[in-house]
């Protein structure tokens, strides 16, 4: 995960954005008014993210069990008598965090580098947090090894399922491979298993899902 966290640098960045806007730069942003709003990822990154926020001095008690709330309040505990509500946590999908920050829905956010690169937005990358580490992989069914190459020779393109169309397209283009990208949002592994695509491009932390579905 990357793309935060230092309270001082966040506040400085937000102030700089407001100064730029006052000088005639009308880029989308929230400015320095109201509570600092942080886009927090749900899912596998959540637990480590809460630990990072807490270590940084933020009260995340409401965030640990938000129920159905999408926005919860917090405070900077280092301020001693901080007022509950001086920080807002917006709970989002990791892949959506860059858009929330880039389009003014949050002042800062936490997500994986994969989401940041795929979003391709002009964002200030504050820090790498050192958790949620994954590897990009290209995989196909083991039982159909070599079929992708034969399909490529026959139709002149490789059909690839991925939730990272921008990254995958660039990767194949750099290698001179003509790829037809099939954009999926979940269960990417199904693409080649059911014969819809030749391969997948995805991220993996342990490789367990690949092994369980006989992908190599």
Model-based region annotation:
Residues 1-27, 32:
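TRNA-recognition modules of translation machinery and tRNA-sensing kinases, especially anticodon-binding
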């Amino acid at each position: 995960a990357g793309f935060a966290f230092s309270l001082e640098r966040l506040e400085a960045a937000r102030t700089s954005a407001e100064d730029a806007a006052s000088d005639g730069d009308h880029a989308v942003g929230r400015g320095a008014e109201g509570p600092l709003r942080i886009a927090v990822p749900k899912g596998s990154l959540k637990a480590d993210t809460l630990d990072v926020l807490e270590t940084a001095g933020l009260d995340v008690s409401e965030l640990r069990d938000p129920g159905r709330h999408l926005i919860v309040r917090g405070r900077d505990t280092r301020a001693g008598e901080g007022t509950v509500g001086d920080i807002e946590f917006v709970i989002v999908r990791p892949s959506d965090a860059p858009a929330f920050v880039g389009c003014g829905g949050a002042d800062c956010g936490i997500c994986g580098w994969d989401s940041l690169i795929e979003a391709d937005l002009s964002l200030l990358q504050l820090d790498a947090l050192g958790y949620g580490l994954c590897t990009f992989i290209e995989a196909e069914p083991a039982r159909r090894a070599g079929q992708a190459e034969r399909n490529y020779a026959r139709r002149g393109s490789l059909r690839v399922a991925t939730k990272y169309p921008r990254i995958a397209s660039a990767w194949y283009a750099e290698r001179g491979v003509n790829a037809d990208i099939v954009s999926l949002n979940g269960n990417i592994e199904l693409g080649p298993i059911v014969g819809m695509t030749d391969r997948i491009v995805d991220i993996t932390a342990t490789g367990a899902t690949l092994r369980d579905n006989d992908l190599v």
